[in-house]
């Protein structure tokens, strides 16, 4: 079992990012850490790498589909992303729940677009569905 691997940034034209691209470009250069979510020069790069790890994990699972051994993935990435909204940057909280890009939403959109599969998202924290509902 491979426990860790480096990730590549998610491509800017990933299905889930198409609508958010202009927002990201406009938000990050001038964002100030005045909300709960702190932003630095490397925040967007880190968020894209975290989302890229999720996309790579999904591709890895599908690469093993139908083989004798099953394959699963768990992505423990920073910054978190499961609460990020596609429609904006919260002026008080910043990236909404300390999240910039919704890794789960990006991964689900990738699974549908690249592998033609339906996706179920099970969000079991206290803010269930926040960012993917």
Role assignments for model-derived ranges:
Residues 1-133:
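HDAC/HDAC-like amidohydrolase catalytic core signature
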């Amino acid at each position: 079992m491979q426990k860790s691997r480096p990730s590549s940034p998610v491509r800017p034209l990933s299905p889930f990012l198409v609508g958010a691209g202009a927002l990201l470009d406009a938000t990050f250069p001038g964002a100030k850490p005045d909300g709960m979510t702190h932003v630095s020069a490397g925040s967007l790069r880190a968020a894209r790498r975290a989302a890229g790890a999720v996309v790579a994990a999904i591709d890895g699972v599908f690469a093993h589909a139908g083989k004798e051994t099953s394959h699963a993935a768990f992505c423990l990435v920073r910054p978190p992303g499961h609460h990020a909204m596609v429609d904006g940057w919260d002026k008080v909280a910043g990236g909404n729940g300390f999240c910039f890009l919704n890794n789960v939403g990006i991964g689900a959109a990738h699974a549908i677009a690249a592998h033609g599969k339906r996706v179920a998202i099970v969000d079991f924290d206290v803010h269930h569905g926040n960012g993917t509902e």
